[in-house]
Amino acid sequence: MSDKEKMEYDVVVVGAGPSGLSAAIRLKQLSKENNKDLSVCVIEKGSEVGAHIVSGAVIETKALDELIPDWKTKNSPLKIKATDDKFLYLTETKSIKLPTPPQMHNKGNYIISLSDFTKWLAEQAEALEVEVYPGFSASEILFNEQDKVIGVATCDMGRLKDGTEGPNFEQGIELHATQTIFSEGCRGHLGKILMEKFDLNKDNSPQTYGIGIKELWEVSPENSKPGSIVHTTGWPLKTDTYGGSFLYHLDNNKVSIGFVIGLDYKNPYLSPYLEFQRFKHHPEIKKILEGGRRINYGARALNEGGIQSLPKLTFP
């Protein structure tokens, strides 16, 4: 029997990304609509909500309109409307403008910092009395005697290298819940345990993965075009390697630039990071970044298999 402190909730959500926070918000909305008292807790491994969100993003607001209909009056970070789209095929020195696929039309959409958006969602969740706890990493899934999930435990903090308790040691806690929602994102360590234990991949197609590398740049004012969106395919990747790029113009002379490569590439010498560096030297990209400076960067694994590769989403 564990001697960890225990806290009881109706629902525990693991991961304070857009999906986890949206789920928590909707649960509290439904509980109020039905005059039910529902306790909801969200834990996040980052030191603050949004700390581990690295994606620049373009958001289509239909789902947000349904979740928070009055979001425009709540000081949301959705400020920069998309103004124009370019979809380019790159050769080593030139760019060819291609017809923009319908699913990539962004009229009426907004360019956002996904990190700022999740921070704002956390504020909306807390306004509905969701308990949001950043800085707590779920390290263990809790099961009852019937092998049903009953919550998660957070990891101990302050252990020394040899595993003993240091002067600032804090023991983890057990969060027990009637329902637990795992919103860890791609390759979450608890999600992998659940997929194996409950055979959640049994009837779906094999998942494929990519890596997304993103940087935030401050560029010269003359190179800044807030609301402008560029996507590319082609160089520096060869035709047998899946991938492409995005470049989003934010406000305050900021540009979010990223490069995605499928991890099923065949060339063992290919380095996604170095391909990204080559990409930034293309004339079409160089003219935007020249004279600027990189102020932030990150990378993230991505699910690329599509809806047919999603695992079963419910389990005991």
What is the predicted role of each segment?
Residues M1-V14, P18, E129-F136:
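Glycine/serine-rich loop-strand microenvironments at binding/catalytic pocket rims
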Residues D10-C41:
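N-terminal Rossmann-like FAD-binding beta1-loop-alpha1 element of flavoenzymes
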Residues S19, E48, R187:
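Conserved Rossmann-like nucleotide-cofactor binding loop
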Residues S22-R26, D116-W120, G185, G212:
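Short amphipathic alpha-helical face segments that pack within enzyme cores
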Residues D37, C41, K45-E92:
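N-terminal FAD cofactor-binding segment of flavoenzymes
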Residues S95-D116, E123, G151-A153, V260-I261:
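Helix-loop-beta segment of a Rossmann-like dinucleotide-binding subdomain
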Residues Q124-I285:
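Predominantly flavin-linked oxidoreductase catalytic cores and closely associated redox partners
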Residues T241, N267-P316:
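FAD/FMN-dependent oxidoreductases across multiple families
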